[in-house]
């Protein structure tokens, strides 16, 4: 089973990992000013009461007066921001998708736990970030582990140093990396048979292999450009 939440982008995450995201949801709830522009907590509670009464809904189920978009990817419906706020706060979960249209359900009702997971501690979240990167990337740097998450760098750096001291990680010199340090687990550095190149498929420009463009350039010598983020005149 998987759930959706933000990692390097909105991603599918194993449901078994949910406990590592509960602290981030709590932190979102503790910063009301972050969402002041999309509406008040009272408006969010009103929307949550509607979902509790009527069941899961999408933005298409909400009829309201339209407003001017704040930016190109915004919605003309004010409730879209409220849905997103409640999602990042851990009050709603994405229970279904039809392309870009998300259906939201009450968080606890969606997961239907007998017992809600215990939130991970700060140390556990740090270890999760490092272990997840090692599993996905094999060879990691501080930037690749903490992509778009600079506040975690200090704790992750300290954990890396501790694991190097215990010989659970080893420093790796990468040609062309300059001063950027890399690490790997010893097992990853054992010689393996060359992979079948036909088995390598990159399905999305949001794939972590490509979205970290400096890393892609370093390892693949490929300067990736995601043209959806470029003005028309700069596209190829």
Model-derived features with residue positions:
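Long, charged, low-complexity, helical-prone intrinsically disordered regions
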Residues: 1-236
């Amino acid at each position: 089973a998987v759930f959706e939440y933000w990692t390097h982008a909105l991603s599918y995450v194993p449901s078994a990992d949910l406990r590592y995201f509960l602290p981030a949801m709590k932190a979102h709830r503790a910063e009301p000013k972050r969402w002041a522009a999309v509406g008040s907590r009272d408006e969010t509670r009103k929307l949550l009461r509607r979902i509790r009464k009527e069941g899961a809904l999408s933005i298409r189920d909400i009829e309201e007066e339209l407003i001017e978009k704040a930016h190109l990817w915004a919605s003309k419906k004010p409730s879209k921001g409220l849905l997103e706020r409640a999602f990042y706060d851990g009050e709603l979960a994405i229970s279904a998708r039809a392309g870009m249209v998300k259906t939201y359900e009450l968080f606890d009702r969606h997961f239907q736990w007998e017992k809600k997971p215990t939130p991970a501690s700060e140390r556990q979240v740090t270890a999760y970030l490092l272990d997840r990167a090692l599993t996905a990337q094999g060879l990691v740097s501080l930037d690749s582990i903490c992509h778009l998450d600079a506040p975690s760098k200090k704790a992750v750096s300290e954990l890396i140093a501790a694991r190097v001291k215990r010989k659970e990680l080893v420093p790796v010199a990468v040609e062309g990396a300059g001063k950027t340090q890399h690490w790997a687990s010893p097992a990853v550095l054992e010689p393996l048979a060359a992979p079948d190149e036909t088995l390598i498929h990159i399905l999305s420009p949001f794939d972590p292999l490509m979205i970290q463009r400096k890393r892609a350039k370093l390892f693949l010598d490929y300067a990736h450009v995601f043209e959806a983020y470029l003005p028309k005149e700069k596209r190829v």
